[in-house]
């Protein structure tokens, strides 16, 4: 698929250009300034930085609708992990109203999962799934939301402070940014069996399984499908950190997320469908340039003939554009499954 670029003209940009064309106000002479006036009080205020994400607004499929059956979200806590010993985590399940336990459900896993649930915010996955499943635009799908691991403080064994935020050492970068199969093994050997132990029937068909995330969670989603396309064949990645945040020495070579375009080009095509998003004002730092990294991934997918969509907007490292695209991305990713 060809990359898509949304360039939305902005009235604010036009106003800014007009303002710059005006004659600047004359500077006040220091000798005429009141002694009680701060030295910088007469300076022209710095122009407010443009909010590149304001143009991305959630559509009707992200809003609760009357007469649409509502699924149920249940929250859990995992105290420890065999794959990542010493690290616990919060997790949750969304089960759609249409799931009756007789037929295996599709599965979608979200990284940084607790940020995707609920009727507010950028993502609203449960609301989007309620609407699309009810309209027959995606299959009956259980969503598994998983937070990255953290080592809880000994005085707070649940790993939560009074503000509800995780305490202790986060394992997020190690789990998400490492280009290894450790995280997908954690999903297949620990988390999905945990879901099944609660009585839910999950399809093992990779075409009926998807995985998604944003930022480091985005590269994590693609990485999981890359290592195990027999387990996940659909990927939703937004503002993906396909940069060298955490290089791993493999056979004498440092392999970080920035090496994925080369890996895609040098490997046989895998049965993975990808919906990817980034913004032209995404991050640039010591680890890389996010827009360039995501564009290189899209170029590699195109060259190898992958089934993909890549949307480059104008946003920053932010979830508003990805959240707006979520309903259409789900329709596109799940178009072959009902």
Regions found by a protein language model. Name each.
Residues 8-17:
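Bacterial N-terminal signal peptides
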Residues 1-6:
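Positively charged n-region of N-terminal signal peptides that target proteins for export
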Residues 25-338:
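Non-catalytic cap/lid and distal C-terminal segments of serine-dependent acyl enzymes
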